[in-house]
Regions:
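Short, small-residue alpha-helix embedded
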Residues: 71-80
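Short, flexible micro-motifs
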Residues: 45-46, 76, 86
Length: 126
């Protein structure tokens, strides 16, 4: 890949991470709750760079995976409907035991807080 391509991808990932940070802040404000982790599922969970940037920007761990979350969710709902799984807790326990999830711990959060503050000062919300 070219340097330009890599720069564009990095710009997109940084923007997404800062948008996630802003969204997390808004959700926390609206609910009055503090969140201890983010679960990133689907295609974005395949990007180590995006996952690490999100952990750094939000200052909390990111649990990445499963990539095929829609398929797993659909399967669990069908198993619930058929009575093969007794409740949502059991479905979640089955998934936790069956799916590999990678954890990204936050680092260098101060730099990300400064970038987020600069975005707010410039009127950028997401």
């Amino acid at each position: 890949y070219t340097t330009l391509f890599r720069s564009v991808v990095r710009c997109i990932d940084e923007s997404l991470a800062l948008t996630y940070q802003n969204t997390l802040e808004e959700i926390s404000r609206c609910t009055g709750k503090t969140y201890r982790a983010i679960h990133l599922i689907g295609g974005g969970a395949q990007s180590a760079l995006l996952c690490q940037m999100t952990a750094d920007a939000c200052g909390i761990p990111v649990y990445a995976g499963p990539v095929e979350a829609t398929v797993y969710g659909n399967l669990m709902m069908q198993l619930l409907a058929l009575g093969e799984v007794k409740d949502l807790k059991e479905a979640r326990d089955i998934l936790k035991a069956s799916v590999n999830v990678k954890v990204y711990e936050p680092h260098d959060t101060q730099q990300w807080r400064e970038w987020a503050q600069r975005r707010k000062e410039n009127g950028i919300k997401s």
